[in-house]
From Swiss-Prot:
PROSITE patterns from the UniProt entry: HISTONE_H2A (PS00046)
Gene: H2A.F/Z
Alphabetical GO biological process terms: heterochromatin formation
Subcellular location: Nucleus; Chromosome
Cross-link Glycyl lysine isopeptide (Lys-Gly) (interchain with G-Cter in ubiquitin), where in sequence: 119
Function comment: Variant histone H2A which replaces conventional H2A in a subset of nucleosomes. Nucleosomes wrap and compact DNA into chromatin, limiting DNA accessibility to the cellular machineries which require DNA as a template. Histones thereby play a central role in transcription regulation, DNA repair, DNA replication and chromosomal stability. DNA accessibility is regulated via a complex set of post-translational modifications of histones, also called histone code, and nucleosome remodeling. May be involved in the formation of constitutive heterochromatin.
The protein, known as: Histone H2A.V
Keywords: Acetylation, Chromosome, DNA-binding, Isopeptide bond, Nucleosome core, Nucleus, Ubl conjugation
Molecular function per GO: DNA binding; protein heterodimerization activity; structural constituent of chromatin
Domain of life: Eukaryota
Source species taxonomy: Eukaryota, Metazoa, Echinodermata, Eleutherozoa, Echinozoa
Keyword Acetylation: yes
Length: 125
């Protein structure tokens, strides 16, 4: 078996499942967490972890991209909870997906239409 195949060359370098999938998020760790959380005695398909990692990575990249743009608009180099809040609430799809309250996120600027007076009438009073 193994001895015949391996003889003459060194053992192959280990390649992580994240690297195989071309992801930054840890596929192995996500797989372990999925196994720990399931009721069916830790039976989780191999591709389930890869797919989950890809989804989490995409969503994280999306939020960070928008938050980075928000911080750039305000001419600062550091992303704060405020920038995350502005990014998430500014995007319709992310807003519907992430309904959690962001600590230190502040509020979204909004003035109701009826409260904004007309330019002409404001000068008269």
């Amino acid at each position: 078996g193994k001895a015949g195949k391996d003889s003459g060359k060194a053992k192959a370098k280990a390649v992580s499942r994240s690297a195989r999938a071309g992801l930054q998020f840890p596929v192995g760790r996500i797989h372990r967490h999925l196994k720990n959380r399931t009721t069916s005695h830790g039976r989780v398909g191999a591709t389930a972890a890869v797919y989950s990692a890809a989804i989490l990575e995409y969503l994280t990249a999306e939020v960070l991209e928008l938050a980075g743009n928000a911080s750039k608009d305000l001419k600062v180099k550091r992303i704060t909870p405020r920038h995350l809040q502005l990014a998430i609430r500014g995007d319709e799809e992310l807003d519907s997906l992430i309904k959690a309250t962001i600590a230190g996120g502040g509020v979204i600027p909004h003035i109701h239409k009826s409260l904004i007076g007309k330019k002409g009438s404001q000068k008269a009073t």
